[in-house]
Each structure stands twice: as C-alpha cells, then as structure tokens.
Amino acid sequence: MLLMILGMTIITVSILVNQITKDTFNKNNPNLDVIVGAKGSPLQLVLSSIHHIDIPTGNISYKNAKNIIKHPAIKFGVPISLGDNFQNFRIVGTEKKFFKLYNAQIETGSIWRKPMQSVIGFNVANSTKLKIDKFFVGSHGLIDTGDVHAEQPYKVVGVLKKTGTILDNLIITSLDSVWLLHSNKNDIKNSRDSLEVTALLLKYKNKTSAFSFPRLINRNTNMQAASPNLEISKLFKLTGEAYKAINYLSILIVSLSFVGILFTLLNNISERRYDLAILRTLGFSKEKIFSIILIEGMTISFLGSFIGLIFGGIVYKSIEYFSLLGKNIIAGQFELI
C-alpha cells in the first residue's frame, strides 16, 4: 500500500506541476510576437524578458530600440530595462504603455508622473507590505544580495489589481528611474541615444512578418530576435521527456504495488485457511469467498490511490507555497532546474 501511495503521489504532483507550469507560461505571455535583445541564448532572452526567470543576455542601444519600434512591420513595441530588485522582486524600467500588455488596472494610487516613482504588483504589495507613499531602495542585480542604491529611493505611487500573471510579482517604474541609477545624468538630460535598455517587447502588424523580421534583426544587427512561442515550445519539448520519465517511474511503482497487494492477498489466504474453511462450512461458495478477497484487494488499492492523490495535492500546495515565499513561482515565476 505504501508503494501505491508513493506512486500516486508522484504521478499527481508531476501532472499538476506540468499543467500549471504550461498554463503559467501561456498566461505570462501577453500575445507578444517577438523579443529583441542582446545576442545570446534566445530562450534566455525570452525567459528573462517576459517570464522574469533567467538573467538578461545583455543590453541594447536605446537609439536602435526606438528605430526598431518604428519599423513598418511593428504594430506595438515597448522597451524594458532590468538590473535591480527589491526583496527578490524585479524592478522593471519601461514606458506607461507596458501596462496595456496585461490589461493592468490600478487598485490604489496612480501611475508614476516623474522619475523614482513606482507601481507595484499585487504580490509585491502583499509580501513586502509596501503601501502608497512608502519608500524603498533597490538592490543591484536580480537577487536580493547586491549593493543597495541607498542614495536614490523609490516611492510607491500605485498598487496594481491582481492579474494572475507575472505582473503581480513586478515593480514597475520609468526608464528614467533606472537610468538615473545606472547612467550618467548628463546623458539623460542631453541625449538618450547613448543610453541602453535590456529588451524590446514587440507585436507585428501582420503575422507574416514572423518569417522576415527575425532574420533581418539576426543577420544585420548586433541584436537578436526571439519568438516567445517558439522558444517556450522548445523548452517544453525538452522538459516533456523528463516528465515522461517521472511518470513511467511512477507507473512502475504503482505496478509493483499491485503485485505486492496480490502477494499479500495470497499470503493472507494461506494464513487464513482455517477462517476460510469456517466460511465454507457456513455455506459460503468458492465464488463468494473469492469475491470477498477481491473486494479486500480493491479496497486496499482504492485507499492507496486516494491517499496518494491527497498527498500529491498536499505536496503540490507545499511546493507552491514555499516557491511563492522564494519568489520562484509556479503560478508566475517558476524556477527552472
């Protein structure tokens, strides 16, 4: 029975994690067609720019970013700038139209009006206890171990309603805010062409541009263009084999548990011959005695499966809870291994 419980627990957790992870990746992509960023791993670019899991591949010129947004193939484009965090929640420098991607709505406060003001996601507000008009300082890097920018604190001016996407775990501010902390102030005042951003989130006017636009960027610039849907499909193709292996192992464990239950029943029959003989003398037929033994085995199997399903749900919820505490989220920011 213990093997049955173990096998069903593993199967339940595997199925839940696999399905929830797929749903989460789908929800976190607001129908973006392509991401443009520094050359490197396309998957890394997608994970860092949309799902905010991996580290960025580097920075690109803000001047080039503006030119790409003006390209005839592009319907919508917004730059983002990464590099800092607060208590492991990433700080994203961007433009106000970024919120349109997620149909985000302000619950309290408003969107920033000047640099060093920020809007925080639903989970950020709950976890950090930040409120409107409160100040906080970001840490350099994407985990909460870097140098603190104590000289330039952020002010919370808005809190977003819950979206069920990665936006709930982000701190959103203006590009100017990020540049003030990492660039020369004279460059911001005089000319922004020398400044940099991390990536561009883009939508096409026409889906046929998916064939020509990435090739144009990848061949003719020092940047790369990556398709979110394509890269995530590749990712799940790779991880799918691991899930299959886990499920096969679970099925093997469950099968062994059935064999174990069978041997247990046979052993019980041998040990309970006297009891069975009494049943025979009381008028029980062989078929009825066999059905009693069969029901006993099915009951053990059912209980093992049921307990395994319950344990699987408990294990999954525990993983989800502790993942949320660590900001490596199954429901928004799943930490890949």
Show where each model-derived region lies.
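Transmembrane alpha-helical interface segments in multi-pass membrane proteins
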Residues: 251-256, 266-268, 274-319
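Juxtamembrane alpha-helical signal-transduction segment immediately C-terminal to a transmembrane helix
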Residues: 17, 21, 25, 238, ...
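Hydrophobic secondary-structure segments that place a key small or acidic residue at a functional site
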Residues: 85-96, 104-185
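Internal alpha-helical transmembrane segments of multipass membrane proteins
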Residues: 2, 244-264
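Conserved transmembrane alpha-helices of multi-pass membrane proteins
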Residues: 310-314, 324-337
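N-terminal Sec/SRP start-transfer signal
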Residues: 1-12, 23, 285, 294
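Hydrophobic, regular-secondary-structure patches
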Residues: 15-90, 100, 114, 213-215, ...
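Mechanotransmission and gating elements of multispan inner-membrane complexes involved in transport
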Residues: 148-153, 159-243
